[in-house]
């Protein structure tokens, strides 16, 4: 099994995506392949309501079909995958560039503390606990702050997040969107 997962991981190469790492570790999400004995194509599928699908290796129409009917962002590894997606879905898709933030960085804790200290009195910064986990699930805009975790227990075990409250209502948050051994993918949302 470890050898096969190594083969699958090699299909993704050094693609710097936390969501892929999360799926490969088996913590969250799923990995699908064209052939379990000798995989040539792989799909890292992540999400619970809306999804990301990272497509790697040789383009494979069957893996692409697994994504049908989902609210999904497909992320092709190369032009060959892009061509298959465009050939399969034509004008039913919208292509766009997805930008990532810098992954290997450090926080200026002093600057963060100044921002917290400058928060107006009527706002409170709180760590996401059981009650705030549930509060984040109530409204669509805040669901991604916790919604990719199977339940509150998984979030408290693997995740991390903070929200800003105004009059006891969640108005903004920063939280783990995905968790892997080396870190988290961060989701930031603010009520519109």
Where are these regions (language model features)?
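Residues that form generic nucleotide/phosphate-binding pockets
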Residues: 7-11, 22-23, 66, 84, ...
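A generic structural signal for short, solvent-exposed coil/turn residues
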Residues: 24, 91-93, 117-119, 154-156, ...
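Active-site rim helix/loop that mediates acceptor-substrate recognition in acyltransferases
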Residues: 15-26, 139-161
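Acyl-donor-binding surface of acyltransferase catalytic domains
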Residues: 28-137
């Amino acid at each position: 099994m470890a050898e096969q997962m190594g083969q699958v991981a090699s299909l993704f190469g050094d693609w710097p995506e936390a969501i892929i790492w999360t799926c490969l570790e088996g913590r969250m999400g799923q990995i699908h392949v064209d052939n379990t004995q000798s995989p040539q194509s792989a799909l890292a599928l992540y999400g619970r309501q809306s999804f990301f699908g990272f497509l790697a290796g040789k383009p494979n129409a069957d893996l692409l079909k697994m994504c049908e009917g989902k609210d999904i962002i497909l992320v092709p590894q190369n032009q060959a995958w892009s061509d298959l997606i465009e050939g399969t879905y034509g004008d039913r898709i919208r292509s766009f560039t997805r930008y990532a933030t810098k992954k290997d960085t450090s926080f200026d804790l002093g600057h963060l503390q100044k921002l917290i200290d400058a928060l107006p009195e009527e706002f409170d910064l709180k760590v996401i606990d059981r009650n705030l986990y549930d509060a984040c699930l109530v409204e669509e805009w805040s669901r991604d702050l916790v919604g990719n975790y199977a339940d509150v227990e998984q979030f408290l075990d693997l995740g991390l997040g903070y929200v800003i409250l105004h009059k006891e209502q969640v108005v903004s948050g920063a939280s783990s969107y995905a968790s892997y051994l080396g870190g988290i993918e961060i989701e930031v949302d603010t009520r519109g």
